[in-house]
Amino acid sequence: EELTGYQASGEIRPSVDLGCDFIMVYGIDPTMPERIRQYREKGYVIHLMTGIAWGEYQEYLDGKWDGRKHWDEGQVDRNGKDVIHNPTVPYMVPTVSFSEYLTDRLKVAVDAGVEAIHVEEPEFWDKSGYSEAFKREYEIYYKEPWKPQHESLDAQYKCARLKAYLYKRTIDRVSAALKEYAKVTYQKDLRFYVPTHSLLNYTQWKIMSPEAELISIPTVDGYIAQIWTGTSREANVYEGVYKERTFETAYLEYGVMQELVKGTGRRMWFLNDPIEDLPSYTWENYEYNYRRTAVASLLHPHIWHYEICPWPHRVFDGRYPRFQPRIAEKIETSFETDQSKPIPQSYSTLLSGMFQLFGDMEQRDILFEGGTDGVGVFMSDSGLFQRTFPDGIVDGEELGDRFRAAMHKNSGNPVDEEAAARLMKEIGEKDSLMYDFIQSAAFPNFFGVAMPLVKYGLPIHPVQLDNVRRFAGYLEDYKCIVLSYEYMKPDAPDVNAAVVSWIREGGTLIYVGDGSDPFHKIDAWWGQRGYANPAEHLFELAGLGRDPKEGVHEVGAG
């Protein structure tokens, strides 16, 4: 059933022969067929994984694939600087040509007999959007001249939405073409998966990605929820304190990811990573956070498939902490120090037990003691599109750099709580800093409503607002849901209609918001109908008028 697996880029050796069900052989370089052969001989089911936004695609960029250079398809920021994964690997604008190249390269994996293909991390950075390739895509899609996203709210929202669409289009094209190739050539049913960060993490890090839109691609068979210490340790604010809350954040991240498969029959693997991408932390720090992400994943019992350990060679053969002197330049080369040590035996033993446990989590008897089930907080893909305010709205200092300084990013140290406390005090005293705080990686508008419920002990779920249009009865398992349109927007009026219908049938909606979000002013359906914001339309549908008083209102049976 392929309950557990991992991804690996190198050849098999005893330290990474973990006895799981499947292996995702990583990368489509010339060594791929030999690596596939080695793992297959060990009895593993073979998948292939590669990046869809970045990778060693120099032959495409240099014009060796089709005779035309494609360096203009790298992502570029407003200052003309390339947005890179490392100095020789740009993040791509996924053009039609690029999708054809990926399809051609991935046919080799189909020829080698893989059972499934994973294209990971469809990522278009919010700060990107200035390359010639993106300008062309904008003009094709919107049928109007390209507009720089930093100049207006509408331009920001439209550019961000297009970035997510472009990766949806690429995944749709590549998956359909490869499935047809496998069927016609080998009479084989190839499976196709998308490993992706959570909607919450991409919203924090300002990376555009299709997320819930992947549900509408029929040739996608499932996903890997790429949640680990590196995503979940991103600090947030609770009761005015800015700090890492790895368990709580991971719990919410895993929760929103299962919304991609709810009611679809598709597969979801939850990833757990015993370390993280940054090698500068100690083994004690890695284990401390691994325990928290692992427990968080186990608190979502409707998912029982796991990627148990990405890159096991760096766990079982690595020595930490390590020093990365040029990480600011995206050069990931690291060096041992006199503090570097191999994995402690006690941690290795714990991991061996966890790997076995993850293969036996299809448990039918589920009980949450002392908690109230059926409580949710709405989240939407549209939250991605309004994470950066255009020029003229943020008048305060750039808080992003100050938050990063408080976190000692890349140093292996936790948040400097004294520096963070000074920063939070300053934000509370200066209105000019509030919008900058809202657009920071702390993502306070979401965590401000979700974190108190988690801290109280409620087993809450992030609820994918977009899905109320896709699935009848999508909200029927919920008794109470928190909604705010201050950090996201409903795509169409029928979203509000579905929410009101759920309320009338007995649901309780807690709406949080004062209508102050500048993105209410974009050219969207609510403004075209004369509403100042989408909440006014929601309230009117509920029979409360456009501006009901704060308090409790009965609507039907809810």
How would you name each of these model-derived features?
Residues 27-85, 116-126, 182-194:
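Glycine-rich, aromatic-flanked loop segments that form ligand/cofactor-binding clefts
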Residues 182, 192-444:
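Hydrophobic targeting/anchoring helices
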Residues 488-558:
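A glycine-rich, often tryptophan-bearing local segment used as a flexible ligand/cofactor-contacting loop or short
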Residues 54-84, 120-151, 207, 391-404, ...:
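Aromatic- and acidic-residue-enriched segments that line the glycan-binding/catalytic groove
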Residues 1-7, 47-51, 118-122, 157-208, ...:
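Aromatic-lined carbohydrate-recognition surfaces of secreted/lumenal glycan-active proteins
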Residues 3-16, 21-35, 53-57, 125-126, ...:
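Acidic-and-aromatic substrate-binding clefts and catalytic sites of carbohydrate-active enzymes
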Residues 2-38, 42, 105-116, 216-223, ...:
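Catalytic domains of carbohydrate-active enzymes, especially glycoside hydrolases
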Residues 48, 52-112, 138, 145-164, ...:
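Active-site-adjacent "subsite" loops/lids of carbohydrate-active enzymes
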